[in-house]
């Protein structure tokens, strides 16, 4: 299907709304905490993708999984870290702190690709990295002075998200340089599965109410499974046309 300009704009608005809903939903949870929040969201992501993938790519998708590719497993591990760290961070500190910390993702990606792939960075990128570092340092210093006991640990957990995302992008670039076309949507399924298995024992005994499970089910289906499927499909098309630094 070819998107018209108007439909493409509304699609972007929709997927942005889906991604931004996690902070709001987390603040409306009644009893679910920390690792249990992550477990239920990841669990419903797995269930959703088990339905979405065959509908989207056909039933043969399961026979095409690159189980022998190390990049597939590393990619799944990165998604697992991102899924787990994001929700745990939201339960530890303010949503704004988490999102600001995650905003360093593109700059971390630039640094990692420079170190491991040898990509050259223009002077403006180095300047942006320095300014971002100063800004984040100033933010951390001002927040620590307020005496919030969870701010530092919450921010450190949130920092795992852009780090894992940067490693993820570097893996994609590396796999492409070796002639492998890594499909990231099955990697999302693997990441959600790993996240569920990791957080399940840490979630016991379950405390989430039916209301909480319903909200986290919405996150798993719409914020992760649906949003990521759309975004990664767009990214795959865009990679054929341009390179992103």
Annotate each predicted stretch with a short phrase.
Residues 1-39, 77, 85, 130, ...:
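Glycine-/small-residue-enriched transmembrane alpha-helix faces in small-molecule transporters
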Residues 18, 54-97, 102, 138, ...:
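Specific transmembrane alpha-helical segments of multi-pass solute transporters/efflux pumps
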Residues 32-81, 108, 164-171, 187-205:
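Transmembrane alpha-helices of multi-pass small-molecule transport proteins
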Residues 49, 73, 121-143, 192-196:
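Hydrophobic transmembrane alpha-helices of multi-pass small-molecule transport proteins
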Residues 10, 97-104, 172-194, 224-245:
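Helix-helix packing/entry segments at the starts of transmembrane helices
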Residues 7-15, 61-85, 153-161, 200, ...:
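Loop-to-transmembrane-helix transition segments
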Residues 36-47, 87-120, 238-245:
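Specific alpha-helical transmembrane segments that line the substrate/conduction pathway
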Residues 66, 99-102, 115-138, 148-155, ...:
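Loop-to-transmembrane alpha-helix entry segments
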